[in-house]
Amino acid sequence: MVKPYLIEHKDEPLNKELIMHIHEMMTTKTLKNAEDEGKFRTTNDIVVANEITNEIVHQPPTYEEIPEFIEWLCKFVNEPAQGTFIHPIIRAIIVHFMVAYMHPFVDGNGRTARALFYWYMLKQGYWLMEYLSISRIIYRSKTSYENAYLYTESDDNDMGYFIHYHLKVLLNSFKELKAYIQHKSKEQTESLKIMREENLNERQAEILALYKNKTDTVLTVKEVQSRFAVSDPTARNDLMVLVSRGYLEEIHVNKVKVKYVIKR
């Protein structure tokens, strides 16, 4: 997985080899030509087009400019004390923008740009990034993402448009994480309450809490086994305990498969 690799290598300086390896990891088995994985493009036969209209929205700089750009990017990341102070978050956003703008690879530039953004944020001590998913939010607002680039290019490369968009993405990511933590905290509180009142073990209480929080929940032994990382016999026993206590009931889908629902 890419994220553990980014975490493991967050203290390393940025260099050409690291950028290429991150691209290779992000694009393995996803490109038309596997030889393009982890390699900078060597042609100018590349444009960025709108996925729906196929309208060309960006013509990346020539491939001859890529070596100089990579050298600049590494210096920008590795020597932040040089020149005007730029806040680390803004600097990370600039890295994201510039990699996607330059399009140093045949494909997978957006994925690589986002990975480098994550990496730089982790490098600067923003450990919470491990738990955020900006890619999901960018995917949901893809038009705004593309427009942020277009507005920047059309307004004399004023990167403020992209920075503003990206900060909103980060804020929404934090909000989603906060909501998730609050939801899980509520689930845990509910589980502890059930565990005390119903004399169940912690895992059984968590299973029952799932049903109480969402009464149309349907689980199988395999799903419990996967969700709680337990063996088949343990998952089966937990569900049978809840059945024997009158909380759940079995529904036989066929001769083999059994589903468990809350008892009405």
Predicted region positions:
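FIC/Doc superfamily catalytic core
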Residues: 1-264
